[in-house]
Structures are given as structure tokens and as C-alpha cells.
């Protein structure tokens, strides 16, 4: 009974290590969170209201400056609300 528990534990631990190793090698190739969030917040051209001189909330701020009340996130390059920990 103890041998079966130990072998199941070792098998499970091996599978977890294999998963972590595969994920680490894939994450070097892809920036999954950034791609996923960009696709979630992507705006279709049909839904755009108007072009402005500044970028609003959750808009890309690479070329445009953010509107007043927003700051450009250094990590995601989107206009976000300023927060004490971002200053």
C-alpha cells in the first residue's frame, strides 16, 4: 500500500515538473499574457466613435499621448488611471 502511494506521488510530481519545464520553454517564445490582454481589449473599427488627439482609457499610447487623468502604463503601453504605486 505504501509503495503504491509513493509511486503515485512520484508520478504526479514528475508530471508537474514536465508541465513546468514545457511552460517555461514556451513562455520564452511567446508573451502570452500581453497577447491575450491585447486581444481582449482590441477595438473593432466599427465600434470606434471618433479620432482624438489623445488616447483614452485602455487605448494604446505608443504614438499618442494619454488624455488628461490617465498615464501610459510602462508595461502594457496602454493609458490607465494613475495610482499611488505607479508614481
Swiss-Prot record:
Propeptide: 25-52
Keyword Endoplasmic reticulum: no
Keyword Disulfide bond (UniProt): yes
Sample GO molecular function, one term: toxin activity
InterPro entries: Huwentoxin-1, Huwentoxin_CS1
One GO term describing the cellular component: extracellular region
Keywords: Disulfide bond, Ion channel impairing toxin, Knottin, Secreted, Signal, Toxin
Position of the signal peptide: 1-24
Subcellular location: Secreted
Pfam families registered for this protein in UniProt: Toxin_12
Its job: Ion channel inhibitor.
Domain remark in the UniProt entry: The presence of a 'disulfide through disulfide knot' structurally defines this protein as a knottin.
Protein name per the record: U3-theraphotoxin-Hhn1a 11
Amino acid at each position: 500500500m505504501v509503495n503504491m502511494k509513493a509511486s503515485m506521488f512520484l508520478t504526479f510530481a514528475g508530471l508537474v515538473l514536465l508541465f513546468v519545464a514545457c511552460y517555461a520553454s514556451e513562455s520564452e517564445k511567446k508573451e502570452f499574457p500581453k497577447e491575450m490582454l491585447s486581444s481582449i481589449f482590441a477595438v473593432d473599427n466599427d465600434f470606434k466613435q471618433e479620432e482624438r488627439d489623445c488616447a483614452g482609457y485602455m487605448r494604446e499610447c505608443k504614438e499618442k499621448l494619454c488624455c488628461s487623468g490617465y498615464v501610459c502604463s510602462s508595461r502594457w503601453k496602454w493609458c490607465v488611471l494613475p495610482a499611488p504605486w505607479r508614481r
